[in-house]
C-alpha cells in the first residue's frame, strides 16, 4: 500500500528524522511520553514491513509493550517487579532483562524485541526500523531513570547479553 506510493527508503528516512526530532525535544523537556508517542508510527510501520512468523510476533509485541508503557507513564503506575519476583533480572527472549520499576521493563523489552528483529529479518528497511526502535527505547530508559540506564548497560556488559 504505502510502499507503492512512497519508497521504503524515504519512509525510513522520514521516520529517522521524526525520531531524532522526538529525542531532541524529549531530552530538552524531559518527556518520555513525547518520545513514546513519536515512536508509535515507527513501530506500526515495522509491523507493516515484517512478514515472518516470529518477526511479526516480535513487532506486535513491541506495539503492545509500547502502548502499555504509555499507560503506565500517563497514569503514573509504579510497580517494582524485582520485589514481586524476588530477582533483579529475568531471562527473556534469550536476553537478561533487569527487573525493577515496570516502566523501565517496557522499553527494555522493546530493545530486546528490536534486536530480535535486527538479527532475524532479511530486509534492510526492517533492520533500519529496528535500529530506530532500539535507540529510542534506550533513550526512553535514560530519560525515565539515568541510573537504571547505567545499570542496564552494566548488566549487558557483565553478562555479554547481546552477543549473537
Region roles according to the model:
Residues 30-40, 92-109:
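Alpha-helical transmembrane segments of polytopic membrane proteins
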Residues 58-73, 130-141:
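Transmembrane alpha-helical segments of multi-pass membrane proteins
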Residues 38-62, 113-115:
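Canonical alpha-helical transmembrane segments
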Amino acid at each position: 500500500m504505502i510502499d507503492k506510493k512512497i519508497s521504503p527508503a524515504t519512509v525510513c528516512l522520514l521516520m529517522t528524522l521524526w525520531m531524532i526530532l522526538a529525542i531532541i525535544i524529549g531530552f530538552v523537556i524531559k518527556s518520555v511520553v513525547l518520545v513514546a508517542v513519536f515512536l508509535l508510527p515507527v513501530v506500526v510501520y515495522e509491523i507493516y514491513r515484517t512478514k515472518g512468523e516470529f518477526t511479526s510476533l516480535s513487532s506486535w509485541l513491541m506495539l503492545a509493550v509500547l502502548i502499555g508503557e504509555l499507560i503506565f507513564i500517563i497514569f503514573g503506575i509504579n510497580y517494582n517487579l524485582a520485589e514481586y519476583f524476588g530477582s533483579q533480572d529475568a531471562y527473556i527472549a534469550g536476553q537478561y532483562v533487569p527487573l525493577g520499576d515496570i516502566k523501565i521493563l517496557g522499553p527494555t523489552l522493546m530493545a530486546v524485541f528490536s534486536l530480535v528483529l535486527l538479527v532475524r529479518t532479511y530486509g534492510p528497511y526492517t533492520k533500519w526500523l529496528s535500529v530506530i526502535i532500539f535507540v529510542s527505547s534506550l533513550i526512553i530508559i535514560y530519560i525515565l531513570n539515568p541510573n537504571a540506564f547505567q545499570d542496564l548497560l552494566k548488566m549487558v556488559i557483565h553478562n555479554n547479553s547481546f552477543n549473537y
